[in-house]
């Protein structure tokens, strides 16, 4: 897997092409990713680079975390992320910035979707509602049957039912990088990405890139 970067969703806006076409874009702020550890096959069994972003007060860092950051000689961040590597070498303290990507490149963006709380099957799974009239009584939004009778005598795993919606890891694939603002550490990506404004997102080169 190719290395990516960790950023923060700043919100959405739009830009115009020279032809006057409006393109909706998500602005992602790419704070410099500080390398905290470089893992090798000899010592860890696989190749990977571990990074952190942002800052965290010393009172909010455990002793183990503080020692890990101190060993890498980097400031404590708000978390650690890891990217598998096939080639290339990094050292603790190296910086990875928005220049890793170029305009026109396709990327996959991973984030935590907005939590919707407890939701019914119509909202959560796009079920159709039942008849409003024609003898239907207080069953307008119920899901209906959830299985058979004595055989098999149970509800199959994975059955679509009411439950907690959102607040889960989501990846949107093959989004286009419209613009890279290296001076302000910004990526402008076409379309929407998962999560709320201010949430952490991971941007990687697309695994299904065309061409």
UniProtKB/Swiss-Prot annotation:
Which GO terms fall under biological process for this protein?
A: translation
Q: Entry's PROSITE patterns? A: RIBOSOMAL_L3
Q: How is it modified after translation?
A: Methylated by PrmB.
Q: Which domain of life is it from?
A: Bacteria
Where is the secretion signal located? Answer: none
**GO molecular function annotations of the record:** rRNA binding; structural constituent of ribosome
For this UniProt record, the keywords arranged alphabetically read as follows: Methylation, Ribonucleoprotein, Ribosomal protein, RNA-binding, rRNA-binding
Keyword Lipid biosynthesis found: no
Q: In the record, which positions carry N5-methylglutamine?
A: 150
| Function of the molecule | One of the primary rRNA binding proteins, it binds directly near the 3'-end of the 23S rRNA, where it nucleates assembly of the 50S subunit.
Q: Which NCBIfam families match?
A: L3_bact
Write down what this protein is called: Large ribosomal subunit protein uL3
